[in-house]
Amino acid sequence: MEKQEQIITTYQQIIQKTELELQNARKRIYYISLLRLILFVGAVANAIIFWSDGWLCLSAFAILPFILFIWLVKRHNFWFYRKDFLKKKIEINEQELRAMQYDFSDFDDGKEFVNPSHLYTLDLDVFGEHSLFQYINRTATPIGKQHLASWFNAHLENKEAIEHRQEAIHELSTDLEYRQQIRLLGLLYKGKPADTTEIKEWANSPSYYRKRTLLRIPPTAVTIINFLCIGLAILGIISASIAGGVFVGFVLFSTIFSKGITKLQTTYGEKLQILSTYADQILLTEQKEMQSHILQKLKTELTSQNQTASQAVRQLSKLMNALDQRSNLLISTILNGLIFWELRQVIRIEKWKEIHASDLPRWIETIGEIDAYCSLATFAYNHPDYIYPTIAAQSFHLQAEALGHPLMDRNKCVRNGIDIERRPFFIIITGANMAGKSTYLRTVGVNYLLACIGAPVWAKRMEIYPARLVTSLRTSDSLADNESYFFAELKRLKLIIDKLEAGEELFIILDEILKGTNSMDKQKGSFALIKQFMHMNTNGIIATHDLLLGTLVDSFPQNIRNYCFEADITNNELTFSYQMRNGVAQNMNACFLMKKMGIAVIND
């Protein structure tokens, strides 16, 4: 636990250091605000005082202070962003400290990914409140969240792919600063989750203005005519009123295009603000040395023709920000009259899109994938006692020592092992209510899933063969589908049989099969199902209250092993060790608990 304490200390130190930086940022904002006020008042006063003393005095005492005022506005904006950045940095480190104590309510739980018909995610509480996803999720981009969820929904089944992902996660787990920078940049974006999808749609949409030659002429022609008129007016060849009339005419002419440009800006202008976030995240990644196969490959995706991806994305961000100046009526009127500013900017934006149409979606996907890797890397960093399991090449193999459930308190969790070293092979677990059977099944399932997505697991040692995971732990009635509990369970078992008949390699975890029928029917069906699994050459774990299932070991002595979780009654008190033992359970606790609660139990 010493390493865990060091990690807690690291987060605390980051908070302390950042709080000092935040104090400094607030002081700078205060002094800049004060200086801006002084300069503005001074510039206005000097303009009034020196108005009649000519342009030289006016420039020296009024215009120059005003220029300095504008520069201070930019510095003010920088320090405001810096303040928000530092506040968010403190916040995410405080969140990590709470998460270390199993309070991870601050993180997105991915409830939109809950799927009752999924092969294992509902049974293992992968998504939703207090879920595995919520515990691990640190994504700060919508695409990153989608990537992370997809990895949980469809785990890897290839040894090399898992090992490559392990390398990437391990590499990022050693770089706390990079991970937090990526997260902070994403969290500071104030847009909506759908924006990235719409940006992709925009990137793939056809250009309108740039493809029409007649629309490309006005910006150049208007600029030439305007400056020619201004030059002729200065030389006295034409009157200033003619030059002014030409200018006004062009202002009116530019309004023809305003409706279409306004539609473009309304649809995409605010959404494209996220590009500055992606530009910063891309730049951060471009500057980072990558060692693992996956991260090197992702970094090569952040490329462009004649410039870096970060430069290209920042260029588009600047073009969109420049177009936003049209919201200032005075500036847009002057620029449209002089150089057809709005149309010129839209044509530049469409030119950018034509060059990078295929690049932008790829860059966004790449940053999203890195964002997802950072979540798993933070999970690895926060659990230094977790290990990366060995991935077996030959089917089927699952061995682990001291497995623990990641969501259980590390100081209270009783850890157990598992050993499946051949195919077919089933572990049958018996035991009393509340003795720990279901928790054990979920512990095995969750760690198996983590291993198959490349993440570290809570075990002293683990070796797995990555067959597809299928569970049936939490079947329920469906009123909407007019489906009984028993029929829902049968459908699940039929799904498993169909997959096995199709030749899929599965690792199956079942809890109390055929719960929706009478005892004799259930027992007969359970015997038949396990025998069918044996003949179909598959592997798994089954938990049951039916002690007679333990006799199957007599028929399959090399392929079935019995384990149990016992409830011990000592001094008229029920106790649980939660330690898995060999053999079939000997003690049951239902009648004992009923008596303790005052419910009459009639003995034969």
Report the location of each language-model feature.
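Alpha-helical coupling/stalk and coiled-coil linker elements that connect catalytic or binding modules
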Residues: 1-432, 439-469, 491-492
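ATPase nucleotide-binding head domains, primarily ABC-like/P-loop NTPase cores
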Residues: 72-73, 257, 376, 382-604
